[in-house]
């Protein structure tokens, strides 16, 4: 099937392959200004614990080059700036200009300057040299990428030998009762909160649907192997609602 006739998931809807990126962009242009507030409300603040665990597993040291991909408002990038010091460098990258602007303003106001750059880029074709980064993270961003396999391969290409890539993403709950409760919450509470806080229920309906369409833990693990990563492992968080996958490059 040619790309012209190919379709892909946009939540539970099938859309032409080339249209998904535009539709996802519309979602994040809409929610950017209140993204941090909604994250706190939707997860009851637990997203901060998930990100803290990701940072702890990153292995980032002073002098490292770090890519925070689909980095949005910069929660991880801010911590990495502190970890790499002035000898290192952090690149906060996002395909969405609105999210990137919010992240840049937020981190600048926090005093994060001198060792950070902001790059608008598509994860599927990263504009960086081969073997460049010591660590790459993508946090709650992979499920929004049209061609996930291509993005993972691009991440592997720009990762240094000896480096690691971390994918923090919603996944499949491993406790049946939790899965049912989570479905009820996702499909009813999230759009309601979106409507009240951002006047945009549809964007949060998409976000809930995109979580269900994202590959489960084992599938994503195999996708990372196929992309070229070594020794891929994952850790479930909050009963599998979220999983952290780590892939190395040797």
Curated annotation (Swiss-Prot):
Enzyme class: transferase
NCBIfam families noted in UniProt: MenG_MenH_UbiE, PRK00216.1-1, PRK00216.1-3, PRK00216.1-5
HAMAP family: MenG_UbiE_methyltr
Binding site for S-adenosyl-L-methionine: 73, 94, 122-123, 139
Function statement: Methyltransferase required for the conversion of demethylmenaquinol (DMKH2) to menaquinol (MKH2) and the conversion of 2-polyprenyl-6-methoxy-1,4-benzoquinol (DDMQH2) to 2-polyprenyl-3-methyl-6-methoxy-1,4-benzoquinol (DMQH2).
Keyword terms of this UniProt record: Menaquinone biosynthesis, Methyltransferase, S-adenosyl-L-methionine, Transferase, Ubiquinone biosynthesis
The gene coding this protein: ubiE
Family: Belongs to the class I-like SAM-binding methyltransferase superfamily. MenG/UbiE family.
Catalytic reaction equation(s): a 2-demethylmenaquinol + S-adenosyl-L-methionine = a menaquinol + S-adenosyl-L-homocysteine + H(+); a 2-methoxy-6-(all-trans-polyprenyl)benzene-1,4-diol + S-adenosyl-L-methionine = a 5-methoxy-2-methyl-3-(all-trans-polyprenyl)benzene-1,4-diol + S-adenosyl-L-homocysteine + H(+)
Enzyme Commission number: 2.1.1.163, 2.1.1.201
Designated name of the protein: Ubiquinone/menaquinone biosynthesis C-methyltransferase UbiE
Alphabetical GO biological process terms: aerobic respiration; menaquinone biosynthetic process; methylation
A Pfam family of this chain: Ubie_methyltran
PROSITE patterns in the cross-refs: SAM_MT_UBIE (PS51608), UBIE_1 (PS01183)
Any one GO molecular-function label of the UniProt entry: demethylmenaquinone methyltransferase activity
Top-rank taxon, per record: Bacteria
Pathway the protein acts in: Quinol/quinone metabolism; menaquinone biosynthesis; menaquinol from 1,4-dihydroxy-2-naphthoate: step 2/2; Cofactor biosynthesis; ubiquinone biosynthesis
């Amino acid at each position: 099937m040619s790309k012209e006739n190919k379709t892909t998931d946009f939540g539970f809807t099938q859309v032409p392959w080339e249209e998904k990126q535009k539709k996802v962009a519309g979602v994040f242009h809409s929610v950017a200004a209140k993204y941090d507030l909604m994250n706190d409300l939707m997860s009851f603040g637990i997203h901060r614990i998930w990100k803290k665990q990701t940072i702890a597993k990153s292995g980032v040291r002073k002098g490292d080059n770090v890519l925070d991909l689909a980095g949005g408002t910069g929660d991880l990038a801010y911590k990495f700036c502190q970890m790499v010091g002035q000898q290192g460098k952090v690149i906060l990258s996002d395909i969405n200009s609105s999210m990137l602007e919010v992240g840049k303003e937020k981190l600048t106001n926090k005093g994060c300057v001198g060792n950070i750059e902001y790059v608008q880029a598509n994860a599927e074709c990263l504009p960086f040299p081969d073997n460049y980064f010591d660590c790459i993270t993508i946090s709650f961003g992979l499920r929004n990428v049209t061609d996930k396999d291509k993005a993972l391969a691009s991440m592997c290409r720009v990762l240094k030998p000896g480096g690691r890539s971390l994918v923090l993403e919603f996944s499949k709950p491993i406790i049946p009762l939790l899965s049912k409760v989570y479905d009820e919450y996702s499909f009813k509470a999230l759009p309601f909160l979106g409507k009240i806080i951002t006047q945009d229920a549809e964007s949060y309906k998409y976000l809930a649907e995109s979580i269900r369409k994202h590959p489960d833990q084992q599938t994503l693990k195999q996708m990372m192997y196929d992309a070229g990563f070594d020794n891929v492992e994952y850790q479930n968080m909050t009963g599998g609602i979220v999983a952290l996958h780590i892939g190395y490059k040797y």
